[in-house]
From Swiss-Prot:
Localization: Cytoplasm
CDD domains listed in its UniProt record: GT2_GlmU_N_bac, LbH_GlmU_C
Catalytic activity: alpha-D-glucosamine 1-phosphate + acetyl-CoA = N-acetyl-alpha-D-glucosamine 1-phosphate + CoA + H(+); N-acetyl-alpha-D-glucosamine 1-phosphate + UTP + H(+) = UDP-N-acetyl-alpha-D-glucosamine + diphosphate
Gene Ontology cellular component annotations, sorted alphabetically: cytoplasm; membrane
Organism phylogeny: Bacteria, Bacillati, Actinomycetota, Actinomycetes, Micrococcales
The organism of origin for this protein: Micrococcus luteus (strain ATCC 4698 / DSM 20030 / JCM 1464 / CCM 169 / CCUG 5858 / IAM 1056 / NBRC 3333 / NCIMB 9278 / NCTC 2665 / VKM Ac-2230)
Region (Disordered): 473-497
Region (Linker): 253-273
Similarity-based family: In the N-terminal section; belongs to the N-acetylglucosamine-1-phosphate uridyltransferase family. In the C-terminal section; belongs to the transferase hexapeptide repeat family.
Region ranges (N-acetyltransferase): 274-497
Stated name of the protein: Bifunctional protein GlmU
Cofactor(s) of this protein: Mg(2+)
UniProt: acetyl-CoA binding residues: N408, Y409, S427, A445
Gene coding for it: glmU
Length: 497
């Protein structure tokens, strides 16, 4: 076996299927697992080969699918993409023929054909397919897998030299066994994945000649293998030990199975890199997430999108982070965060909701039952419990009391609250934006801050407490409160109020 270093001239990704068994208004290849659509995974694997050209063949919901593919290609840095349209002639042979037509007419070298609904195919396997194909001078190289149950798959039939003689479809193997009593073809467990490396010149010669004179009325790509052998070309194979690499998603159950397998692969990778995953069965990490060594993921953790978690951080239990950055040694528990930045040594949760634009500085804290949005919180600042901070800036080492909120919305526009450094706010303070509180200022419990507070000042609302002694026994006689008050020596005065 050769080293996987060859670069193909082109990769053709077949993405024209409708996917009716998904029973969805979303095209099959746009369904997602592990943070990417099915076709996104296929394009990423294809582009890992660094081909000169990459073609996606589309048909069903053409405009929507093509736009999605172009968006994914831009995200992956693919700069050699072409979109080809499949016409009314059905079959994989026709799809590849139209994909080939989108490539330069004088293209030489290796053309890889793969599928847009096979998300677990690895770059390493594709590279090995190309390398062996070119090193051995094959006309066609088939990617195969060996299954416990090969029902429904085309069987790999080999000649005396061990090369691929032909691919026998399952129904043909059954028919042969029924008519001859020979079930040797049915017993074959090595199957065709539908993924190939071809010589480009061979495809140009043979694809136009493929007939639709068959039961399905389709142009079968597998016919190229027989044509190659008729020309004296070598048809060989490369096998994968992981059968999940060649599994497609045709319905929701298969989509779920593939998602679970992909997640297991992702978690195994990160555990090898020094990440502790306490319970892999309840932990989900997208392929786009970045983790550092000595990160700990506790049960119920979900990490999505461009989330990154730095060394020594602990996430979970029961936390969902999307496009969120977590700093070194930070602790995030029972938190839902989207597009947030959590500084080193910071603490979040439990039961915390960080909305887009939340930036928590180093050593900061956002505690239980807090919601934040578009807020920058300085180093060492604390928002410990029961509050809302939105459209705000909070300075370093400020302590925000229990039940504080920034009243940022006047019914039409959002307004900003600025709270300085080393501020101390009393419980249930309301900041009616726009308002600024200077460094070192205090607010009293229950204060409604409607005007700017200078540095070092105390802001409180001057409402004196009024106490009506004996009110409960007089006004709520017969209640348990009245009985308790009388037992404590209170007398009902009949005071008004």
């Amino acid at each position: 076996m050769s080293q996987p270093s060859a670069r193909p001239s082109a990769v053709i990704v077949l993405a024209a299927g409708q996917g009716t068994r998904m029973k969805s208004t979303t095209p099959k290849i746009m369904h997602a697992i592990g943070g990417r659509s099915l076709v996104g995974h296929a394009l990423a694997a294809a582009w890992s080969l660094a081909p000169e050209h990459l073609v996606a063949v589309v048909r069903h919901e053409r405009a929507r699918v093509a736009e999605h593919i172009e968006t994914v290609a831009a995200q992956l840095g693919i700069d050699a993409l072409a979109i080809a349209d499949q016409d009314d002639v059905p079959g994989t042979g026709r799809a590849v023929e139209l994909g080939l037509a989108a490539l330069p007419a004088d293209l030489e070298g290796t053309v890889v054909v793969t599928y847009g609904d096979v998300p677990l195919l690895t770059p390493e396997t594709l590279a090995r397919l190309v390398a062996d194909h070119e090193a051995d001078g094959n006309a066609v190289t088939v990617l195969t897998a060996t299954l416990e149950d090969a029902t429904g798959y085309g069987r790999i039939v080999r000649d005396a030299e061990g090369l691929v003689e032909r691919i026998m479809e399952h129904k043909d193997a059954l028919a042969h066994a029924e008519s001859t009593g020979d079930d040797s073809f049915v017993a074959i467990r090595e199957v065709n994945s539908g993924i190939y490396a071809f010589d480009a010149a061979l495809l140009r010669r043979t694809l136009p000649a493929i007939s639709t004179d068959n039961v399905q009325g389709e142009k079968y790509l597998t016919d190229v293998l027989g044509m190659a052998r008729d020309e004296g070309g070598r048809v060989a194979s490369v096998g994968t030990q992981d059968v999940w690499e060649v599994e497609g998603a045709n319905d929701r159950r298969q989509l779920s199975d593939l998602g679970r397998r992909l997640n297991e692969r992702v978690l195994r990778h990160w555990m090898k890199e020094g990440v502790t995953v306490v319970d892999p069965s309840s932990t989900w990490v997208d392929v786009t997430v970045t983790l550092s060594s000595d990160v700990t993921l506790k049960p119920g953790t979900q990490l999505h999108g461009a989330t990154s978690v730095a060394t020594g951080a602990v996430v979970g239990p029961d936390s969902t982070l999307t496009d969120t950055q977590v700093g070194e040694r930070a602790v995030v528990k029972r938190t839902d965060a989207t597009e947030a930045v959590i500084g080193a040594d910071a603490s979040i949760g439990p039961f915390t909701y960080l909305r887009p634009g939340t930036v928590l500085g180093e050593e900061g804290r956002i505690g239980a039952f807090y919601e934040t949005k578009k807020v920058t919180i300085g180093r060492g600042a604390k928002l410990s419990h029961l509050g809302y901070a939105g459209d705000a800036e909070i300075g370093e080492y400020t302590n925000i009391g229990c039940g504080n909120i920034t009243a940022n919305y006047d019914g039409v526009n959002k307004h900003r609250t600025v709270i300085g450094a080393h501020v101390r706010t009393g419980s249930n303070t309301v900041f009616t934006a726009p308002v600024t509180v200077g460094d070192g200022a205090y607010t009293g419990a229950g204060a409604v801050v409607r005007e700017d507070v200078p540095a070092g000042a105390l802001a409180l609302n001057a409402v004196s407490q009024r106490t009506l002694e004996g009110w409960v026994p007089a006004k709520r006689p017969g209640t348990s409160s009245a009985e308790a008050a009388r037992a404590a020596g209170a007398e009902g005065s009949g005071a008004q109020g």
